[in-house]
Amino acid sequence: MLKQVFETTDLKNSFQVEIGTYARNVDPSVLIRFQDTVVLTTTVFSNKKNNFDFLPLTVIYQEKFYAAGKIPGSFLRREGRSTDHEILSSRLIDRSLRPLFPKEFRQEIQVINTVLSSNPDFKSEIASILGSSLSLLISEIPFFEPVAGVYVAYIQNQFVINPNAQQLTNSPLHLLVAGTKKNVVMIEAHASEVSEEMFLEAIVFAHEYIKKLCLFQEDVQKKVGQTKKLIDLDAELQSLEKEFNEQYHEQTRTLVANVFEQDQKNDLQVFKKKILAKAQQKAFVKTIDQITFFDVEEQKNYLLLIENLFQKLFNQEMRNYIIKNKKRPDKRTLEEVRNLDSQIDLLPRPHGSALFTRGQTQSLAVVTLGTLSESKIIDDLSGESNKRFMLHYNFPPFAVGSIGRYAAPSRREIGHGNLAEKAILPLLPEENDFPYAIRVVSEILESNGSSSQATVCATSMSLMAAGVPLKRAVSGIAMGLFMDSKTNEYVILSDIQGLEDHIGDMDLKIAGSDKGITALQMDLKIEGISQAILKQAFFQAKKGRLHILEHMNKTIASPRKEMSQYAPKVQMFQIKPEKIRDVIGSAGKIINQIIENHDGVKIDIEQDGRIFVMHSNLETVKQAILFIKNLIQDAEVNSIYHAHISRFLNDKAGNILGAFAQVSPSIEGLIRFSKAKKENDVVKIGDKVLVKCVKINERGRIDFVLISKK
């Protein structure tokens, strides 16, 4: 493909798209330029047919340190495994694209977004969504609807598209929206207790900009787009599916009705076994005209296919029943939340713990408090920073009664932990008010849907139990949607369980306090939803959230005044930055003495003069702070001090003119003798004395008079 360049013209901040220059073994690759940010997107797909019952799409987002003119800080000085930020960004892009592929398409696709140049004032994920969509759109892959994403902030009473870093710092709203010309397909947001109304306004505002980016992509497609590949449907499989549905449709519909009306869930397994047994009898016949025999592997694949056909038919009948009858499999009403149970203080040694159970979903949240020096160090394209609040989400296989591998956290675990972390963060106290690093681990002990929102609830209660002065309690809820694509009839479900999530069309997670929303995430399995549906889901979620908060407040309504006896005690105080060297001393001599003399107390000193002192005993902390304050205090005229003689002042002839008395490393003054002496009979070096400050000149030099010698 020849090099071609396109540029958005009707947008305030223009994107430039270059096609046909880079990565020419890929067809196509797209280079996006926006405000010094450059992202290369490549798309490759396999012609091999797969028997997957899902779309094997892999999206990778990677940042190169050279993009910001930096050398990696790792030992090897090169990029390593994906960071949490890269994983979360990959998930964002994936969630924006996946709903728009035809359900029948099953060929493997890999989309890679590489950040080659980075402007810290612009979110590279926005360029990556645009590049990924455009790359797929102009390829022969059956991807027909362009998608685009924008970031929205709220600055000085107005919404701002793709704000810079400074604007984001001052915004109560951080919203990323992806959508097509017609609908929104993905939302990711965190906020400082923002109302549902503001969120909805921001989404509408974002969608107007998204439409323009989608139209731009369509214009590019008309000029350079390839002919789309036809989806090669297996005629034999289609025939088998049609025959299967005709044979079992009515029985499956009756079975679904029995599950809903009479709670006959055992009938499902009996019916399924009956179908598989019948299929097994036919498994040796491969053709009609000539009898041949399946080998063992073919028999296995055939039975798996029949099982998948049954599950597909059953799921569709379940969906139809829920939409038509407005009923749920577990007999709840559409807005009803599952049974709730919560406890705190389950574990004696950790600094705080809480167990939150909602139906068959259960999260155990455990809090650990530490010094700020134990904060997580993040080194990325925007520079090095510290993260004092960490929430880690673990989903072991036993949570769903399975056997599985224990390995590094999965993308899903990282994503769920990040969502819960963002939900809690706005309610945490400021660093100066609560100078601790905080780590929360959520162990999912049972799971039947909405475990990330159970994590939010358990974390909120565990922090209060640990004595962390959380401003308000935070709860979360997951909302679902079932929509008939032919009639547009739909139902919205509150607090979805696993089955409803699996066969439904939407997973909308909303967390917040009684004052507003703090985190939001929406994923779809359909090509988008209207503003009306979104509005209904938001306010239905609010009702459920407040119900859950009411329950949580019965367990613990406010943070404890006292922390656990096993939690470290940290206090912070401020000194002048120029006094830091007096606390540290030459080669760390003084600070090491302070630590040694105060039972190994931990001391962290920041460049701005803040000092954090930590120990398990509060009295030890106070003694260390008092010692440091005395150490760096400034001298005052007429004040009396305990000191020691540190050295003498001599003239050129060697006569002793006076002696220097040191009170602390920052206070040293001169005791002047009435007349010069060859030999001093008043004091000796090392003598302990009591002195009075009588003068401090304009250069800060101190004069003492000797009161007495000890």
UniProtKB/Swiss-Prot annotation:
EC number: 2.7.7.8
Enzyme category, top tier: transferase
Subcellular location: Cytoplasm
GO molecular function list: 3'-5'-RNA exonuclease activity; magnesium ion binding; polyribonucleotide nucleotidyltransferase activity; RNA binding
Signal peptide, first to last residue: none
One of the protein's GO biological processes: RNA processing
Predominant subcellular localization, coarse grouping: cytoplasm
CDD domains referenced in this protein's UniProt entry, alphabetically: KH-I_PNPase, RNase_PH_PNPase_2
One GO CC annotation: cytosol
Domain KH positions: 568-628
Alphabetical UniProt keywords: Cytoplasm, Magnesium, Metal-binding, Nucleotidyltransferase, RNA-binding, Transferase
Cofactor entry: Mg(2+)
Record-linked Gene3D superfamilies: GHMP Kinase, N-terminal domain, K Homology domain, type 1, Nucleic acid-binding proteins
Catalytic activity: RNA(n+1) + phosphate = RNA(n) + a ribonucleoside 5'-diphosphate
Domain S1 motif per the UniProt entry, residue ranges: 638-710
Protein name per UniProt: Polyribonucleotide nucleotidyltransferase
Source lineage: Bacteria, Bacillati, Mycoplasmatota, Mollicutes, Acholeplasmatales
Gene of this entry: pnp
